[in-house]
Amino acid sequence: MTASALSKWPTCLACLRRLAQPFGTSAARHGEPRARAVPVIRPIVHTQTRAASHRMRLQDQGVVVRLLEDIPKFGRKHAIFRIERGRMRNEWFPKNKAEYMTPARFQELGLTRDAIGEVDRSFVIMSALEAATRPKPEEQKTEEPVPEVQISQVNVPDVTPETAHALLSELIPNTLTFHREPVPIPISQPKPALEPKISPLIARHVPASTPETPSTGEARRAIFGSVSSSDILNQIKALVSGHEEASRIVLGPSSVKIVGLAEDNDRIRHLGRWEIEIAVARAGGLDPVRKSVEILPSAQ
């Protein structure tokens, strides 16, 4: 079965002209009358064929992106390369793994097109590599257990309360000295009082005025920092550390008490002399060891 002449529409102008002519006749040549036109037998079917184009289409090289995190088999963070548009649009950009590198973005980062690199297929994150090389639980069970080395503990005899009381009384000096920088006292200059005018004969018999002595509050000057019971305890431990038996005495934060301070206060904040009590554990009827602490101004 033959196809009709109009089954396929021609696309060139010459084919349209041939189809527009009547069948059985041909157009007269230039200068010849139409009556002398020579009849020509034309086929009814006109099939137009076109060869397929073998030209290579330009391959889409993808879009330029910049990684915002390490991605295995693609590259490290801040790497710039080309990637498929679909992967960037559907996976990386929604999950904030990469950003588009537009000309404006290149200018913001101070980069040029020369910074565009290649995909690093050999890049592997170390955590993923460690997870891949980590032995499985079944393999860990098959490993032989390493025998534990047992260290024998040496039993050190405890110091009796009576011995501890005697050693602390002997090794600790009567006064423990600490140096702190005192807070300067602002000096206010009083206005000179107007002296009444008296006769020189009377002023000769008036006794000279004596300077005023500082008050008790000025004598107890404040200091920068403070001396706590922990500071006193550390100094006591340093004094007894050289003695073989006294170094085994158990002393804790509650072993030192500063006499004259409130119960919730264990810090000395002024210059002066303070009494302390050193309690011995399990002392029973023994009194605490009494010593003194003196806070002196540090050398300027």
Curated annotation (Swiss-Prot):
Gene3D superfamilies: Ribosomal protein L9, N-terminal domain. InterPro entries: Ribosomal_bL9 (IPR000244), Ribosomal_bL9/RNase_H1_N (IPR009027), Ribosomal_bL9_N (IPR020070), Ribosomal_bL9_N_sf (IPR036935). GO terms for molecular function: structural constituent of ribosome. Pfam families: Ribosomal_L9_N. The keyword Ribosomal protein applies. The keyword Nucleotidyltransferase does not apply. GO terms for biological process: translation. Keywords: Mitochondrion, Ribonucleoprotein, Ribosomal protein. GO terms for cellular component: mitochondrion; ribonucleoprotein complex; ribosome. It is found in: Mitochondrion. Component of the mitochondrial large ribosomal subunit (mt-LSU). Mature N.crassa 74S mitochondrial ribosomes consist of a small (37S) and a large (54S) subunit. The 37S small subunit contains a 16S ribosomal RNA (16S mt-rRNA) and 32 different proteins. The 54S large subunit contains a 23S rRNA (23S mt-rRNA) and 42 different proteins. Belongs to the bacterial ribosomal protein bL9 family. Component of the mitochondrial ribosome (mitoribosome), a dedicated translation machinery responsible for the synthesis of mitochondrial genome-encoded proteins, including at least some of the essential transmembrane subunits of the mitochondrial respiratory chain. The mitoribosomes are attached to the mitochondrial inner membrane and translation products are cotranslationally integrated into the membrane. This is Large ribosomal subunit protein bL9m. It comes from Neurospora crassa (strain ATCC 24698 / 74-OR23-1A / CBS 708.71 / DSM 1257 / FGSC 987).
